[in-house]
Every structure is written in C-alpha cells, then in structure tokens.
Amino acid sequence: RGLGDVYKRQVYDEFSTYIGAEISKRRGNILTYNARGELCVVGDDIGEFRATGNLQTKFKLLKKDATISAEGYIKNVTPSFYMRHFHSRYFWWDNRDMNMIQQIYAGAKINLESTRTQLSAGIESIQNYVFFNKQGMPEQKNGNLQVINARIKQDVMYRAFGWENEVAYQLSSDKSVLPLPQISLYTNMYLKFKVAKVLMVQLGANMYYNTSYYAPYYEPATQQFQVQDEVKVGNFPLVNAYVNFHLKQARFFVMGYNLGSKFVNPNYFSLAHYPLDPFVLKMGVAVTFNN
C-alpha cells in the first residue's frame, strides 16, 4: 500500500472443533509406544487431521542401555493463517485458494550408551509445500517435495579428555523451494579437570561447519525466511576457543569467537546478507544465589 492509500480494518473470525484419541504404553523395559490422532469435524479447518506414533525398545549392550526407536506421522493440515492473510505497509496478501498440506514422515533412531553413539535417519514427503518466494510472498509448490536426513553423533570420553562430534546429511528434492546444506558438522574438544580440588576448569575449542548452499534471506518486515539464488552461504569453519570456570555457585568464561576469521578468507555468513561477527573476545559471569 502507498502512503496515500486508505486502510480498511478487516476482522477475521475462525474456529475449528476437533475430536481425537490416544493410546500409549509408557512402562516396561521391552517395548513402549504412543499413538494419537485428531480430526477436525466442524469449522474452518474441517477435514484437517493428524496421526502420530512412536515406539521404542530397550536392551542391554556391554552392560549399558541401548535403545532403538521409530516414529512417524501423517498430516493433512490447512496452511497457517498468516500464510493466507497478511496486511502491512510493505506486504499485503490474501491467499484464499491455498490447498491443504499433506505430510508423511518416517524415521528411526539408535542410541548406544556403551559407545556413546547415536544414529538417526528419516524421510519426509510433503505435498503442497508452502514457502516464501524471492519476492517475500507465500507460494505453494505444485507436486511432492521429499526430504531425507541422516545424523550420527559420537562422543569420546577418557578421564579429563572429551570429544563431542555430530555430522548430519540432508537432501531436498527441490532446492529452489527448500534449500538445505548437504553436510553439517559440529565438533567440540576439551579438557575438564579440577584445580586445588575446588575449581572446575574446562579448556577447549569447538567448530561448526556446513557445505555451501543458497541459504534463505531473512525478511524483517514479515519476520520470515525467503528463498534466494544470489549468494551462497557456508563452506567456512566457525571456530571458537574457550575456557570455563566453575567455583561453587559462581561460573565464568572467556571465549575467542570466530578465530577462523583471522586465518582464512572472511566469507562468513549465517544467512544471505547476514554476516557473522568477526573475531570477538567474550567474557561472562553467572552467580547462583540460594534463598
């Protein structure tokens, strides 16, 4: 709307009534499960339904717990209100012809306490996926969108030494509407020990990294992320070094943030056109007071 346009107040009144059921077994060492579903029978979202479920089994491996779990859902949902209606000075839309979104997901997870290992994977199919296009307007994709993800988390602990690692793989069947970095990783290496039997010290460094991709642009006017194909983000290691101290009820830290900016090409962005902070030395103190 322009400065000379006349604004008209518009009131929306929506309601929906759902019926649902749930069945679960939360006790037991061999098998636990939970399943629930709901259906909209009256109102603006009539026909909308959600069905979710998960199950888990537990057993001993090398004298420690190991679990295998699976989860999934089927959904048929109406696009959110602000995807259909939004009125502001810079953006204005009324999408009355949007179709319902269908989602089918299946995933599994393995957790091995004996080796400090976690494995997970999942696949999702989305029909009529809604996204924000390059102009910052909501748009609905025709056809299916598939997303595959796999993740492994491996921790190594030996006396004072700790090493935490996590790697994720993601694949989108249509990167023009849902861009994802193909590989993301996090690693954190540290030493944790006591000084004079009272001061806990943690000295270490961590790193975040993801492969380059056309990361979404954040539009402040709508507070949403929209797709773009102008600049790629990623392929830059965000390295931080830190020292944490814990003395009774007091905790304090010193961190060198984004050390990599001192040694490599400063092409570091978290989102399109949103750079990360350059090297910064951070310090902080926290004290817990008991009443």
What are these regions (language model features)?
Residues 1, 5-291:
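Exposed, low-structure sequence patches enriched in small/polar residues
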